[in-house]
Amino acid sequence: MDDVRTVGTGPHRVLGLHGWFGSSQGWGQLPDYVDRSACTWAFPDLRGYGGRRDEAGEHTVAEVARDTLAVADRLGWDRFSLVGHSMGAKYAQQVLVDAPDRVRALVSISGVPAGAVPLDEQGRSLFTGAADERANRYAIIDMTTGNRLPAAFVDGLVQHSLDVSDVEAFRDYFHAFCDEDIAAAVAPVADRVPVLVVAGAHDAALGPDAAKATWLQIYPNAELVVLAEAGHYPMYETPALLVAAVEEFLARV
């Protein structure tokens, strides 16, 4: 499956859903550090990204969830844990809604919450312009990593997003993760699985305070881990610490 990157051969099966600027190949060093004997990880491309860049789609929350379950079926996975980065965490929640009996655990890394994301006019303009403007993509990544990292680091993430994503799909996914509200659908299944919420202290958009106001309000049993030296992209900024936190959690569920 060219659109799914797999790592490891362990018994605990994990599906990783990438973020807006990511792809199946855009997980930083996380795949390098995972315990390959404990878990089998699968990182699919969303429609419009990577191996599916030219595949048409609606680019909605519901569609991503359907596609994710289809990937699990292709892999022969009846049960699995979900790890979602950024917008991928919102889509992972819809998978939980659609198939709660198949989800073993849920991990949010800098995750977009279930509800709609409130943005002021300036913020919305910045994000909606990112589909067409490289400078907007740079500004978003720089801001969400604390305006503290080398320009080459930020520009590398920008270039990856430009290389792997279709512009129209990228544009559509903003509306999916920002405007769609699935909180009411999530509420009835919020206590069905263990949940880990990982937030970077330098993430100006979805940091610890945002996580406490959203994820921890919806999921009564959620655990919060704050990575003190990370922003929105801990798989690039502090990958070893991220993997340690995620694997400690997955080993318990």
Task: Give residue ranges: language-model regions.
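Active-site loop/oxyanion-hole signature of alpha/beta-hydrolase fold enzymes
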Residues: 31, 40-83, 87, 244
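Alpha/beta-hydrolase fold catalytic core
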Residues: 1-15, 33-40, 77-78, 146, ...
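Post-His helix in hydrolase/transferase enzymes
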Residues: 236-248
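Short beta-to-alpha linker loops that shape the active-site pocket of alpha/beta-hydrolase fold enzymes
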Residues: 45-50, 112, 230-231
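Conserved loop-alpha-helix segment in the C-terminal half of the alpha/beta-hydrolase fold
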Residues: 196-230, 236
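Flexible "cap/lid" loop of the alpha/beta hydrolase fold
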Residues: 93, 97-98, 103-133
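Conserved alpha/beta-hydrolase catalytic His-Asp/Glu region
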Residues: 117-118, 134-189
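Conserved HGGG/HGGXW glycine-rich cap/lid loop of the alpha/beta-hydrolase fold
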Residues: 6-54
